[in-house]
Amino acid sequence: MSESKVYPVKAHISNGALLDKAGYEAMYRASVQDPDAFWGEQGKIIDWMKPYTKVKNTSYDPGHVSIKWYEDGLLNVSANCLDRHLAQRGDKVAIIWEGDNPAEDRKLTYRELHAEVCKFSNVLKAQGVHRGDVVCLYMPMVPEAAIAMLACTRIGAVHSIVFGGFSPEALAGRIIDSGSSIVITADEGLRGGRPVPLKKNVDEALTNPDTRVSKVIVLKRTGGNVAWHNHRDIWWHEATAAASSDCPPEAMNAEDPLFVLYTSGSTGKPKGVLHTTGGYLVYATLTFKYVFDYHEEDIYWCTADVGWVTGHSYLVYGPLANGATTIMFEGVPNYPATNRMSQVVDKHQVTILYTAPTAIRALMAKGRDAVEGTSRQSLRIMGSVGEPINPEAWEWYYRTIGEERCPIVDTWWQTETGGILISPLPGVTDLKPGSATRPFFGVQPALVDNMGEPLEGATEGNLVITDSWPGQMRTVFGDHERFEQTYFSTFPGRYFTGDGARRDEDGYYWITGRVDDVLNVSGHRMGTAEIESALVAHPKIAEAAVVGVPHEIKGQGIYAYVTLIAGEEPSRELHKEVKEWVRKEIGAIATPDVIHWAEGLPKTRSGKIMRRILRKIATGETDSLGDISTLADPGVVDKLIREKSEAA
């Protein structure tokens, strides 16, 4: 096999695994040769109120992109995650909640979770939420976040979750775009020992005159002081106290919207990724089962926040549809002690751990302290998600956290894909550190050059997917034209991922990162355009350009070139002020790591900023700038290089 390091499947894994190499090959072959037959059979992994007779009805044709799966079937997501388990697994723990403070934890059985979801479903109905309405969630990592999600699905409402780290401005934009008239939040969140002012942020977001929110349901998490609007605000505990724990699930069409989740694009404002009910749930359920080699007795921990797609698919829906025990962690991996993540593994006897390279690199920087005094013997499978994992971090994770016992499933997928597209499978795949390896069933990746010509064999190029799969997003909320433009216009007839990849001689895929103007910071996607817009909204800034630079913990750091308006001078105070400004406009996650005060930016004669050059300057690769003859003023480049060395 190519690439220096290969870790073959270990006997103790293959002996108990759901699939072996031959099983994978046969299933994969069937999935691409006859998708209708394959997905028709796999669709039965969930329960249907009215079985489907149609399976796949999809088109990637220019101007006619349309994606439908199981389109005449009826089902309910919450019934699949709860009701169907009550007879056999009613007393099994569904959610283990581990608080920010290690002294706080809770367990909810499937029966208890079912009752809470029914109560909250009735609360939503009483507040006038109807089938098809969009409900905005801005919640901490507590079981009530999952309860609210499942309650929406029970009554046929569409949830739009906004990560609790986003600013009031970012929250308002998402509330307006989705048309939410109700927000579910908490007084405060807790993270790393510090309160997060969720209710205060909601109050501020709702001062935007374009919001149309009539009700805010508030969970009491910390008991911190919050402002109160009597006609608008409702306490969660008061509303649920009198609610009935009986609420029959709505029969939803497979193509009814399930949720909207906003993600950054390379241009303009974030786009609402729309996922529908049937195909999404089939895909989340099936990928969870096979990628994590799920067995009934497993204790599964995905460290992602519910505000990200990983939290949707692999903390809530995938695990619960499989009847698994899923851990929900409010805190951060290194608080109050460096070995917190390992402590949680031991405390709850976690068998499957799914986390992000950023967390792994942060722990790796602490060395053995990250595992001090813990055994982690319960671990069986470990996963990585959010961005490509560098081989050094992979090796450390494998050796130090998993003690060379646990295969690592390095999963590649996106908000848009609904679930994992490329990943090793335990029991099947020999591992190579840093490679996402092979495609999941029904997923047909290809590499193309910049002209869209297919590249064969071992090569590198733009990663496209040539046919649809059930978990694929259906459209951009309210803007199908943007959906086609973003994903299907670059390489017509194919879904363009926006990522580059390398394929080795064993057919393994190595994701090389974004090829568009999107950054991946700590596993979170951010469009450079979004950060640039926030910067130029500052009254003293005339122009800004943002590029990604390597960062040893976050994967990518944010490097901002900033040109001030005439008459303004750079200063330490302004530097601090600009960082604060971005934090307020978008959230702490978008704060620039470097601000480079630039007199001018390299532009073509048509006025386009040459980001390629800015990237090279930011990373110090100034001896390989390439052709700069098309620049309107080539002298700008020397000036930028000088400024950088002076700033350093």
From Swiss-Prot:
Its EC number is 6.2.1.1. One of its GO terms (molecular function) is AMP binding. ATP binds at G386, E387, P388, D410, T411, W412, W413, Q414, T415, D499, R514, R525. The keyword Membrane does not apply. Acetylated. Deacetylation by the SIR2-homolog deacetylase activates the enzyme. The keyword Acyltransferase does not apply. CoA binds at R191, G192, G193, R194, T310, N334, S522, R583. GO terms for cellular component: cytosol. GO terms for biological process: acetyl-CoA biosynthetic process from acetate. Keywords: Acetylation, ATP-binding, Ligase, Magnesium, Metal-binding, Nucleotide-binding. CDD domains: ACS. Gene3D superfamilies: 3.30.300.30, N-terminal domain of ligase-like (3.40.50.12780). It catalyses: acetate + ATP + CoA = acetyl-CoA + AMP + diphosphate. Mg(2+) binds at V536, H538, I541. Belongs to the ATP-dependent AMP-binding enzyme family. Catalyzes the conversion of acetate into acetyl-CoA (AcCoA), an essential intermediate at the junction of anabolic and catabolic pathways. AcsA undergoes a two-step reaction. In the first half reaction, AcsA combines acetate with ATP to form acetyl-adenylate (AcAMP) intermediate. In the second half reaction, it can then transfer the acetyl group from AcAMP to the sulfhydryl group of CoA, forming the product AcCoA. NCBIfam families: Ac_CoA_lig_AcsA, PRK00174.1. This is Acetyl-coenzyme A synthetase. It comes from Aeromonas salmonicida (strain A449). The lineage of its organism: Bacteria, Pseudomonadati, Pseudomonadota, Gammaproteobacteria, Aeromonadales.
